Amino acid sequence: MRFLSYDSVLARGEIAARASLLYARLEGTMYRPDTIFTVETAGWPGDWEGRTILALTMLAQSTGKEPAYLDEIVERLGDYCNEKGYMRQILSDGDVDEQQLSGHSWLLRGLCAYFLFRRNDPVRSETVLGRIREIVQNLFLNAAGRYAEYPILPEERVEDGKESGHIGRKIGHWYISSDTGCAYIPLDGLSHAYVLLKEYAADRELTEKLKALLDEMVMHFYTIPFLDIKVQTHATLTACRGLLRLYEYDRDPKKLAFVQKIFKLYVDEGMTANYANYNWFGRPEWTEPCAIIDSFMLAAQLYLHTHKPLYAELTHKILYNGVLASQRPNGGFGTDTCTGADGTAAAEFLACSCYEAYWCCSMRGGEGLASVSRYSLLEWSAEESRRTDGYPNTVEVLYPMDGIYTVHGVKLMVRADYPMEGKVTFRILENPGNKPLTLYFPKMQYGNKQEPCFVSFCSGEVVRDVDVELHLETAAGKNNGSGKILYAGYQILGHIADDKSTDLPDMNDLQQYGKVWKTSDGTVFAPISARYLDTPEAIQQKKIQILWK
């Protein structure tokens, strides 16, 4: 079973509209070639540039729109690198700066994605491959041996951080960040570079040294006391995505087991009532869409590798109530308050903290929204299809999402009212061999409540009705209290209120009117995922009650 490739997916409908808004935002002035290399990045060299390159590359593929400035940004990158081929300072005496490593991890991710996107252009792809090799060789390999010394004692990690982290002090050879644990974000960028270099670069010595560094990082990542030192959840989850990429390469069961362990820790100790995140473990001060997107991607990837229903359910809930609820009217992504957190004021309310984290989260939205389209359908292998009564060319519907998909050589269009309503249409657009295509619908507690089923067709369309049921649930996580949350299917419904909490509505008194639900006295409950349709002023002023005692 595998996710579809990016070039097999074309977003349509609302997810395409959201992606287009973000695309326009990321082609604005501060993300253009004349500006991007000179903006203030608060000590994160390579971060702004890398996240932007990654976002534009992913959005180009998911929307089918050619990016206006992406190629020029990549072409001009070398003008802003030092003589060793990476950005900003060259440290001496074996010193390492964890924010420099973290920022360059995003630069590696962006360049790896761009290489694959432009791999049929030999001039561009070879230049980028050379840049990837230089960054690995001249920056990251200098960190070999240092991860054993990474400061992980509570008394060493006492920095207070803001929504953009900063370098605090030096301990040993490490310049440490208020974003505790960000030295492990490179598990993501370096694992991507390792897989790419193994396939496309004939440099065995470099890849062996890189593998040794990755092994060192993984070994010490296993030892981090995440709660004791309040590790940043974005750093934690990004590192776990890198660890999972390595698992996909070497199939080491210890890696998969550890990712599942840490993801459970995150759900229990680092997740808000609306499936967003605490920026750090143990510090429910604000959310960060970077981490929310990480958690969505991890949930879907863990479902792919384990097929455990829990991960499918979390994929839905994080997507609709965490990722999509964090997008802003301008297409970017911003931070919110931590709903449900024990001991915090107004824990029942979802409210804006920072309207837009334009320096990081808006760019992370590019891979996030592209992954929403890509992860919706899972293509089964021939062997997996044979194990299920021989249904041919099976594609599993993890969640229905508007788009045009190429699966098993068949071009398929999906039209979905879900999750607002239950009607989903699957239409075959092109099927050159007239082969049967099989749709598999897994059982979902508040989606497809029927038994799992297979539907095969060669042409025409299949219409599926998915249950979208009103119900109450207790907030997930160990720190979100016992309050009740109102759901329609997997979407959280909220009520715009002042600071004063309202009473829980009578479920029998709620009726759906279009995209909202109302009580007989006119009280409105709307999906929090639709916040991006509001005005910027409303986003910053409104408080939305989502928890009821």
Q: For the regions a protein language model found, what residue spans apply to each?
A:
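Beta-strand-rich binding/interaction modules
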Residues: 434-452
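Hydrophobic core segments within long, regular secondary-structure runs in both alpha-
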Residues: 13-17, 53, 57, 67-81, ...
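Well-ordered alpha-helical scaffold segments within catalytic/enzyme domains
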Residues: 2-3, 50-65, 106-124, 174, ...
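Catalytic-core region of carbohydrate-active enzymes that cleave or remodel glycosidic bonds
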Residues: 248-268, 283-331
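Solvent-exposed loop and edge beta-strand segments that line ligand/cofactor-binding
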Residues: 33-50, 88-107, 148-184, 221-250, ...
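Low-complexity, Ser/Thr/Pro/Gly-enriched N-terminal "stalk/linker" regions
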Residues: 1-51, 55-91, 130-134, 144-148, ...
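C-terminal beta-rich recognition modules with glycine/proline-rich loops and embedded aromatic residues
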Residues: 313-328, 332-419, 469-549
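A surface-exposed beta-strand-loop module
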Residues: 448-479
